[in-house]
């Protein structure tokens, strides 16, 4: 079903120095969202079954949410090359995403705020240490954060997602939290530039009606994330690019058994998101040749050769479970992936 909403907001902030070593940044945002007709809003019982409904005509405004979102940041300058930064922010999200994690399905649905789906609100604090080396050639940082979330959403068990006009009845809400730390080093000058980062994180949810009310991994919980990006300028015309990424596999829910009811096979699942897909990683390489690098030339262009996923890693996109044709009592898993190695050529120009 289609849902319509109008979101508006206003923000103001300020930055000021406190003596010679402190910088204070603060601000506040006022956000408002209105659901707008045409549309039909259903009322549901505790099991997600529709009870009755209200119809709104085209242009009707209903169900307004208003929120204040403060931000606060403090920078402590230890010396000319290092600093400590801390921050707090409240964020309200009026459009939420719910993901069907069963068997690694990539099926995601976006939900605007409505009488049945409240806006997600989060409070986040962060603390980091930042240090520059070699006259700013290298930038390093170590930063940690903690976030608490209210009104996080997820689907019920065995939710019907396709062509379901009562889809909001399949949504449950609860709390969530995440925390982690990121280590980064960046080189900004010289022929070789780029950055490398490692992030360790944890993301959890606790939603009544899901996983027996016990905490479980959020769909985006990926404890380890590594990124390495480099660019080497051989001269004004020729440059090379290198990117390697790695991430822990996405949490998924796999069936561990099945039973038959009225000639229908019903899968039996484990706890929510208790399995993981295979880890994701790939290497990308590129070569760029620039024409007409002279600043006086109005017409400039470049030719780029790139290879996506150089070593042809088959990163899983979807895992489905199927029964053998000759023996339906035997079930096997089948993995689907989108892209293996993918070379490309791009010509760019500007004038």
Language-model-detected regions and their locations in the chain:
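Outer membrane beta-barrel strand-and-loop segments of large Gram-negative receptors
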Residues: 1-3, 7-9, 112-118, 124, ...
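Signature of Gram-negative outer-membrane beta-barrel scaffolds
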Residues: 1-83, 94, 105, 210
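Residue-level signature of outer-membrane beta-barrel architecture
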Residues: 12-17, 22, 66, 74-77, ...
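Short loop/turn motifs that connect adjacent beta-strands in outer-membrane beta-barrel proteins
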Residues: 18-21, 81, 134-138, 191, ...
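Transmembrane beta-barrel strands of outer-membrane/channel proteins
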Residues: 26-32, 86-90, 108, 129, ...
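Surface-exposed extracellular loop regions of Gram-negative outer-membrane beta-barrel proteins
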Residues: 34-48, 76, 80-124, 144-168, ...
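C-terminal beta-signal and adjacent terminal beta-strands/loops
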Residues: 92, 237, 246-262, 278, ...
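Gram-negative outer-membrane beta-barrel transporters
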Residues: 145-148, 167-256, 348
């Amino acid at each position: 079903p289609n849902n319509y909403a109008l979101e508006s907001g206003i923000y103001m902030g300020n930055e000021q120095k406190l003596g010679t070593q402190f910088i204070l940044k603060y601000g506040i945002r006022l956000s408002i969202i209105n659901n707008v007709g045409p549309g039909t809003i259903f009322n549901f019982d505790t099991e997600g079954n529709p009870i009755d409904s209200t119809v709104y005509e085209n242009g009707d405004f209903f169900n307004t949410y208003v929120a204040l979102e403060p931000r606060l940041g403090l920078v402590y300058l230890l010396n000319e090359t290092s600093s400590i930064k801390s921050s707090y922010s409240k964020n309200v999200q009026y459009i939420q995403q719910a993901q069907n994690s069963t068997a690694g399905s990539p099926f995601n649905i976006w939900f605007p705020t409505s009488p049945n789906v409240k806006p997600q609100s989060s409070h986040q604090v962060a603390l980091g240490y930042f240090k520059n080396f070699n006259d700013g050639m290298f930038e390093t940082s170590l930063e940690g954060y903690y976030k608490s979330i209210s009104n996080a959403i997820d689907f019920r068990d065995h939710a019907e997602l396709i062509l379901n006009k009562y889809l909001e009845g399949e949504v449950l809400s609860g709390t969530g939290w995440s925390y982690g730390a990121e280590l980064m080093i960046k080189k900004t000058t010289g022929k070789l530039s780029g950055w490398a980062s490692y992030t360790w994180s944890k993301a959890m949810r606790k939603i009544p009606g899901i996983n027996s009310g016990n905490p479980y991994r959020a769909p985006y919980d990926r404890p380890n994330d590594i990124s390495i990006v480099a660019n080497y300028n051989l001269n004004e015309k020729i440059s090379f690019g290198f990117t390697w990424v790695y991430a822990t596999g996405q949490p998924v829910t796999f069936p561990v058994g099945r039973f038959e009811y009225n000639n229908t096979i019903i899968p039996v699942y484990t706890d929510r998101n208790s399995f993981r897909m295979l880890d994701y990683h790939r290497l990308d390489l590129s070569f760029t040749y620039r024409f007409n690098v002279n600043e006086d030339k109005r017409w400039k262009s470049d030719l780029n050769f790139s290879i996506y996923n150089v070593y042809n890693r088959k990163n899983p996109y979807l895992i489905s479970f199927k029964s053998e044709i000759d023996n339906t009592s035997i079930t096997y898993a089948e993995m689907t992936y989108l892209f293996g190695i993918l070379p490309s050529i791009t010509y760019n120009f500007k004038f």
